[in-house]
Regions:
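Specific transmembrane alpha-helical segments of multi-pass solute transporters/efflux pumps
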Residues: 16-61, 103, 186-204
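Transmembrane alpha-helical segments that form core, pore/gating elements
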Residues: 9-12, 74-76, 80, 111-168
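Helix-helix packing/entry segments at the starts of transmembrane helices
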Residues: 2-3, 48, 62-69, 136-158, ...
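Juxtamembrane helix-entry segments on the extracytoplasmic side of multipass membrane proteins
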Residues: 1-2, 26-32, 91, 106-129, ...
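Hydrophobic/aromatic residues within transmembrane alpha-helices
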Residues: 54, 59, 80-82, 86, ...
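Hydrophobic transmembrane alpha-helices of multi-pass small-molecule transport proteins
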Residues: 12, 37, 86-108, 161, ...
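Small-residue-rich packing faces within the transmembrane alpha-helices of Major Facilitator Superfamily
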Residues: 5-12, 72, 98, 155-159, ...
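Hydrophobic/small/kink-forming positions within alpha-helical transmembrane segments
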Residues: 40-45, 49, 71-76, 102, ...
Length: 256
């Protein structure tokens, strides 16, 4: 929560330094304000909160599989809104991405999915929130810029979570390592990751961007192998191939 607020303030200061007037233009129209608040609360804040609660009530693999059903929700919504059936290559890419995520998260063993009613509710809620995170800010970013929208969204989401979670009650020891770790989370894990992804949403649309984001479990798997010494199983290679195949298909589709 504190990271979100800090990251939001840094982004807004960047916007203020370059274009002071544009920073507050987003608050002029009621419709824009409503979308921004919905994005900050349900897109930014609730997306992460629901995912971590799903992890807490089950495990990371189960929560990841449930959250990455979001591309299905996004593709269905975009199809209905545009009154257009997705292309076959898009549907195949969707199957490969979701299937690949399932294999990486569970290693192909369905018994690794610990799904209680509570987990199912929070996991699907995180998928819906992830879809909203992709769909809500599209028009806002085109009008006001990615940095401006993400900055306000992070600040709103961070304040919203602070009201309920109260991070200032958390007791911890601050040393140089804590400061460096916090700086890395804010600069790389929050500002860089969120802004680059949302710029991708602005450029290619929510449906394709959410499928490209399926590369995240691939990266997480490699990090686990490199830094934690986890074994990379054969089924993981199949999941990896499925996700990368989906990304390649979408890349070729974009070129066409």
């Amino acid at each position: 929560m504190a990271c979100k607020c800090a990251a939001g303030l840094i982004l807004l200061l960047t916007v203020w330094a370059k274009q002071k007037k544009q920073m507050f233009e987003i608050w002029r129209e009621k419709r824009d304000v409503f979308q921004l608040i919905m994005f900050g609360i349900f897109g930014m804040a609730f997306c992460q909160l629901s995912y971590y609660v799903a992890v807490e009530t089950s495990n990371a693999g189960t929560a990841t599989v449930l959250q990455y059903t979001a591309p299905i929700i996004i593709m269905l919504y975009v199809s209905v809104r545009n009154k257009k059936v997705p292309q076959r290559i898009e549907m195949l890419a969707l199957v490969l991405a979701v299937g690949g995520t399932f294999l990486l998260a569970t290693h192909g063993n369905i018994t690794n999915l610990a799904i209680s009613t509570e987990t199912l509710v929070w996991g699907l809620a995180s998928a819906v929130a992830m879809a909203l995170y992709n769909l809500i800010p599209g028009e806002l970013m085109k009008k006001f810029g990615t940095f401006n929208v993400i900055g306000w969204g992070m600040l709103i989401g961070g304040i919203f979570l602070c009201v309920f979670i109260k991070p200032w009650h958390v007791i911890g020891m601050w040393d140089i390592y804590t400061v460096l770790a916090m700086a890395a989370v804010i600069l790389v894990g929050t500002i860089l990751s969120f802004t680059t992804y949302m710029e991708g949403v602005r450029l290619i649309g929510a449906s394709k961007a959410s499928l490209f984001a399926s590369v995240e479990p691939v990266t997480a798997t490699f990090m686990t192998v490199v830094f934690m010494g986890a074994a990379f199983q054969f089924v993981d290679f199949i999941g990896l191939a499925g996700i990368l195949g989906a990304v390649l298909m979408l890349s070729l589709l974009k070129k066409e």
